[in-house]
Amino acid sequence: MMPSSLPRQGGAERLRIIRIYLCTTLILLLAYGIWYAGVWPGPLGQDGYSLIANINQSAPRYTGKDPAWLLYALATYGLSQRVEVLVLPLLLLQVAALARIIGWIYVRRYPITATALLLLVACTPHVLNYGSSLYPDAVFSLAFVALLFEIWLILGHRRLSTWSIAWLAILFPAACYFKANGIIILLPMLYLAIRLKTTSRWVIVAIVLSWSAAIQWGGTVANLGHGHGALRPLILFETTNFMQTRPMNLWETRHMVTDRTKEIMHRYISQEDIDSLYDRDYWDTLWHLNQDRVRFREMSRIDFRHLRSDFFTYNLWRNIPAFTASRINIFLASALAQGGMVGPDNARHGLAGVTTLSTYNPFNLSSLPNTLNEIYETSYNWRFVLWSPFVGIILVLLVFKRALQERHLDELVISSTLLLQLGGIFLFSIAAEYRYLLAFFYAPLLLFPIRFIQQNRDPLPCQKCPRSRSTRQPVTSTP
């Protein structure tokens, strides 16, 4: 967590930096430790319940999760049969990543910004709740943002340090492979490798290739599959949307999908179930639930190939209004946290349905669990303000705009990566889950430094821009 170039600082300054990082780490450890003690072993949710149940049955691939997350779960919960063994290392990683960024900001003498990010981002009840749960979204989102932060620092100095190499190696697998949309992080990693000199470039390549090969090999050996991906759920969910019965029964709306699409879909779900089981906010009713009535899991490769072809050649274009409305609805329902939520005390009842060595509240704390529930519920009632990802989204747009105006390639790559992530979430989400947008709640940790804390900058020459606009006074900083 500490800068790599501490030896080059004066003695008093070195002590100041050490104190800042230690204090930040201790505050975060205290906050996360108290929270986890009150929710031990952590909220399960439907995904956590499925993960534990399938690992217990030696069938983790049927969770539909990505191989990297399943490998981690097998190496922790699978070997110990304890949920806390899975959660605690992730909590420590989150504390370390947050202390790294917030401490860096404080060292640059922005105490108000650092304190605001500590209180309004790092230690908010919903972040603590997701961070201690069996969902990979919190650690994935934070790792994604923290890895972009490290890339930004390295690009500012055009060199790798021991600390930066360690951070890249630690954060990369979670940021890239814990969820399918993490693959986007390969773009800034590739850009970083190109911008660095030969030796450093090969270090980046080695980190990417070694982790990628290890996860691919582990997933193959453990027969973990490839998850359900993003395209299949989208096509099935939206095709069901397009096939909803229209009460007006207008002539113009009688052929909203191809005859072949109707034939394929009706092999696996009846029209009555298409009308009754479709939920505009969730695809769970078509996949995870009602498997006696919806047999999409049994769909043959040939049928899905034909369905995919019809979707992109006719069905999508015939239903642009319905598709756009569906995308906007799910995105806004997610951003406003109007979907399902897992409370802090979820494990109280969730553990009863699975076989595990973990127990709820093993410390027999009497008031802390109830207090945390009350804090969480109060925060939830103000979620439209306190949980809003729109601050991060606005900052992404501001940084992207400035990068275009100043033709600053480094910032353009960083902000474009987040915009691609946002576009992917908008286009491919099939459930109104707030956790999908957690990366943009974390985004101010990265974007406030980029937007407001000057870093060594080397903008591309722009003949149309005044020199004073594209050149800034550098501030000495260490990665």
Kindly label every feature range from the protein language model.
Residues P67-L71, L79-A99, Y130:
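Loop-to-helix entry region of an early transmembrane alpha helix in multi-pass inner-membrane enzymes
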Residues L88-R108, L142, A146, E150:
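Transmembrane-helix motifs of polytopic, lipid-linked glycan transferases
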Residues H226-T359:
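Membrane-proximal stem/loop segments at transmembrane-domain junctions that anchor or position
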Residues N56, V139-H157, W167-F172, P188-M189, ...:
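Specific aromatic-rich, kink-prone transmembrane helix
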